[in-house]
Amino acid sequence: MRVALLMGGVSREREISLRSGERVKKALEKLGYEHTVFDVREDFLKKVDQLKSFDVVFNVLHGTFGEDGTLQAILDFLGIRYTGSDAFSSMICFDKLVTYRFLKGTVEIPDFVEIKEFMKTSPLGYPCVVKPRREGSSIGVFVCESDEEFQHALKEDLPRYGSVIVQKYIPGREMTVSILETEKGFEILPVLELRPKRRFYDYVAKYTKGETEFILPAPLNPSEERLVKEMALKAFVEAGCRGFGRVDGIFSDGRFYFLEINTVPGLTETSDLPASAKAGGIEFEELVEIILKSAFLKEGVRV
């Protein structure tokens, strides 16, 4: 099997993608798969036809282009098989506003509004969360407890993104649920509870060793664990996700509040999905092989 490994990319998550890609590359080498690395940059479209000579594309491009449905649509058009969700599901999950509207009534979502212009005070009161519609790795996310912090968040995000989501802050326990697709169906890995040393699970907390305590499995009673897993899988399936992914949310007062779906989650040494896989008895090389094989679970290319 010939594997094209796509890493890097043009988004603000480029460095994380390179870290994920290097780790996947080493795993492919250990597994004995013939592979070629593509460090995706602005000129990638000139080279995309080269991918036709490979059996499958292993996509570890985080953020815009690689995770938002753009790459997936190109690969579908060219008839190239790839890991992860299709273009439609990727688009839905990358844009949080679209995700919330699409999943409304399916899972419980904290109150939210879209803001396109500067405001002096939060329409949802405090504390609240300000975040971009289309971004990953908690880039551009602010937890605000005052007008001053809220105004600062808008001044940072509005010029860059044009519009932002303001969401009610739910105090509780941060949970992430990783899901793999195998021949037997969807496998839900052990629920991971995140206890960041910082204010919340931001970029630094995600990718710096020692900044976040991983509790695996999350200390939940059987009914709580069942609820968290059921709600996460419900969101994943409703959004049409495939292959592998991660569902993030807040567990508070016996309820699971959905926050987002990551269709190309990080695979670095500090990432959530590999940690959950290991807790479930799946070492990293096996995880990579499961993700790779999931691309072949449907005949032809996803449509």
Swiss-Prot record:
UniProt catalytic activity: 2 D-alanine + ATP = D-alanyl-D-alanine + ADP + phosphate + H(+)
EC number(s) given by UniProt: 6.3.2.4
Binding site for ATP: 125-176
Gene Ontology CC terms, in alphabetical order: cytoplasm
Pfam families in the cross-refs: Dala_Dala_lig_C, Dala_Dala_lig_N
UniProt KW Ligase keyword: yes
Pathway assignment: Cell wall biogenesis; peptidoglycan biosynthesis
Keywords attached to this entry: ATP-binding, Cell shape, Cell wall biogenesis/degradation, Cytoplasm, Ligase, Magnesium, Manganese, Metal-binding, Nucleotide-binding, Peptidoglycan synthesis
Cofactor: how bound: Binds 2 magnesium or manganese ions per subunit.
Molecular function (Gene Ontology), one example: metal ion binding
Keyword Isomerase annotated: no
Cofactor(s), by name: Mg(2+); Mn(2+)
Signal peptide residues on this chain, from the entry's feature table: none
ATP-grasp domain boundaries: 99-293
InterPro entries: ATP-grasp (IPR011761), ATP_grasp_subdomain_1 (IPR013815), D-Ala_lig_Van_CS (IPR000291), D_ala_D_ala (IPR005905), Dala_Dala_lig_C (IPR011095), Dala_Dala_lig_N (IPR011127), PreATP-grasp_dom_sf (IPR016185)
Gene Ontology terms describing biological process: cell wall organization; peptidoglycan biosynthetic process; regulation of cell shape
Protein name (record): D-alanine--D-alanine ligase
Function: Cell wall formation.
UniProt-listed Gene3D superfamilies: 3.40.50.20, ATP-grasp fold, A domain, ATP-grasp fold, B domain
Localization annotation: Cytoplasm
Family, as annotated: Belongs to the D-alanine--D-alanine ligase family.
Residues the record lists as binding Mg(2+) 2: 260, 262
